[in-house]
Amino acid sequence: MIIIKPTYYKDFKCIAGDCPDSCCQGWEVDADDKSLEFYKTLNPSLEIKQRIDRVLDKDEFDNNIFTLAPKKRCPFLNDENLCDMHIAIGGEHTPFTCRTFPRFIHDFGGTREIGISFSCPVAADMMNNMQGHLQFESEYMDELPTLNDIDAATYIKLKNARQTAFDILASDKHITERLQELLLFAKDLQEELGDCEEANVPISFQDVFRNPELINPEWLEMVDNMQIKPISNTNANENIAAYFIYKYFLDAIFDLDVLSKVKMAVVGVLINTYFGEDAWTVHLWSKETEHSQYNMDRYKKLLKEAQCLKTNSILCMLK
């Protein structure tokens, strides 16, 4: 299997208790089956075993979760913002989500792509301060690929198209010109892949980002204080767009909707520009949206249906 990662990936280090926005607070903690099987083997007299049994529960979808403590804190997060489970039985036995966050993993046949989500403030800060264009490195791992039914021809077409998208973003033009070119490229590519009709649902740009499932009230304050202004021609904005292209572009293999994926990249720069223009802004958006299935499903739907997010509407915002 071929493993692809951004070159900055190896430099990421969790700052644990010093994190300004703990990933152990604000959202549910899923308990995966493999971890649960291990917890069953723990000595019943162990304090950590008893704590696990006390807080283990089911959500409305019958998924195994740990009941959150007050202020939506993970029940194993101690007063120093460190994980008691990690301390007691080792990080390798924490739930899969905890072991991998903020990393994301996408498998496409014999290729695995790995990255770091903006929902981690350290990762967002790394991308915000990174100089130069987003670069990648690859290595071979002796591991069987995950079986999936992707169409090889479509995968190759989209992979080549994604490289074109990266090339557009890496040009010497002003970022607004690059984003316009990127969006028009996606529109043409979408016509080749098949119709993906845009609707005219009346909703304001601000209301798009007033998520029904609120994790951090600070995000809503940012949305309420939106300021429309020109996009800064910075590495940070280029890297924001490149992040979305890397993370989402190839998902079009499954639904042939490449236009929405590219819209997400372009709108990501508008989010940064209108709501705060710093790493914290992008971090909060990511935590609020990318890590809430409800909010993310709503956002993906609006990328197709909202009048303010139609291709021509976004192009007007880029002028």
Residue spans of the language-model regions?
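A structured, charge-rich N-terminal accessory region that forms the first stable segment of a protein
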Residues: 21-58
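Hydrophobic, aromatic-lined core segments that form the binding pocket/scaffold
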Residues: 167-319
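Alpha-helical scaffold elements adjacent to nucleotide-binding pockets in ATP/GTP-utilizing enzyme cores
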Residues: 38, 97-100, 119, 299, ...
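Gly/Pro-rich turn-and-neighbor structural signature
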Residues: 51-81
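Internal, well-ordered alpha/beta segment that forms a basic, Gly-enriched binding/recognition surface
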Residues: 81, 89-177
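Local cysteine-cluster metal-coordination motifs and their immediate loop/turn environment
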Residues: 11-29, 69-104, 117-124
